[in-house]
Amino acid sequence: MIRSIIKSSNNLLKSNVAINSNKRFFATEASATSDLLTFSLLSPHQTIYKDKKAQLVTLPGAKGIFGVAKNHVPRIAELKPGVIQINHENGDLEKFFISGGFAFVNPDASCYINTIEAVPIDQLDAEEVKNGLARYTQLYNDAQEENAKAVALIGLETYQQMAFACGVSA
């Protein structure tokens, strides 16, 4: 009886190893005709890009900056305020400032970036960014309650990232 259990366990272990070795870690089923990623950049009020081809999209993840290209491992990532950099199919580089959001990287070499706001870097007004940074720094320093301090900190961190993106110093 024990030998039968051991034999069954060994067979199960061997089949489990075979199953685990078939796991995919990259989007290997993606189209073999292109070395490009298909991405969409979306906000609630605007579709900036829909199914656009790119070589690479660099994103400001909550756990650090990361790049997405064709064959990237599927994932869902929280995005923090920062810069999205798009290396387009033709080699052109484009940058957007986003307010945060989520990125969905799929096994079919597609990526959906959902954000509340996305603004081309060249459309950021340096003077407005400087004023916003000063305003939220003051709000943060003056905040007495935890809730007010947390709200001010969100604004401060967002404006700090905007300042960095457009080259404004404090």
UniProtKB/Swiss-Prot annotation:
Cell compartments where the protein resides: Mitochondrion; Mitochondrion inner membrane
The entry's keywords: Hydrogen ion transport, Ion transport, Membrane, Mitochondrion, Mitochondrion inner membrane, Transit peptide, Transport
GO molecular function terms attached to this record: proton-transporting ATP synthase activity, rotational mechanism
Biological process annotations from GO: proton motive force-driven ATP synthesis
Major subcellular site: mitochondrion
UniProt transit peptide range: 1-33
InterPro entries, per database record: ATP_synth_F1_dsu/esu, ATP_synth_F1_dsu/esu_N, ATPsynth_dsu/esu_N
Regions crossing the membrane: none
Pfam families reported in the protein's UniProt record: ATP-synt_DE_N
Domain of life: Eukaryota
Any single Gene Ontology cellular-component annotation: mitochondrial inner membrane
SUPFAM superfamilies, alphabetized: Epsilon subunit of F1F0-ATP synthase N-terminal domain
Oligomeric and partner information: Component of the ATP synthase complex composed at least of ATP5F1A/subunit alpha, ATP5F1B/subunit beta, ATP5MC1/subunit c (homooctomer), MT-ATP6/subunit a, MT-ATP8/subunit 8, ATP5ME/subunit e, ATP5MF/subunit f, ATP5MG/subunit g, ATP5MK/subunit k, ATP5MJ/subunit j, ATP5F1C/subunit gamma, ATP5F1D/subunit delta, ATP5F1E/subunit epsilon, ATP5PF/subunit F6, ATP5PB/subunit b, ATP5PD/subunit d, ATP5PO/subunit OSCP.
Role noted for this protein: Subunit delta, of the mitochondrial membrane ATP synthase complex (F(1)F(0) ATP synthase or Complex V) that produces ATP from ADP in the presence of a proton gradient across the membrane which is generated by electron transport complexes of the respiratory chain. ATP synthase complex consist of a soluble F(1) head domain - the catalytic core - and a membrane F(1) domain - the membrane proton channel. These two domains are linked by a central stalk rotating inside the F(1) region and a stationary peripheral stalk.
Family: Belongs to the ATPase epsilon chain family.
HAMAP family: ATP_synth_epsil_bac
Name of the protein in its database record: ATP synthase F(1) complex subunit delta, mitochondrial
Organism: Dictyostelium discoideum (Social amoeba)
Lineage: Eukaryota, Amoebozoa, Evosea, Eumycetozoa, Dictyostelia
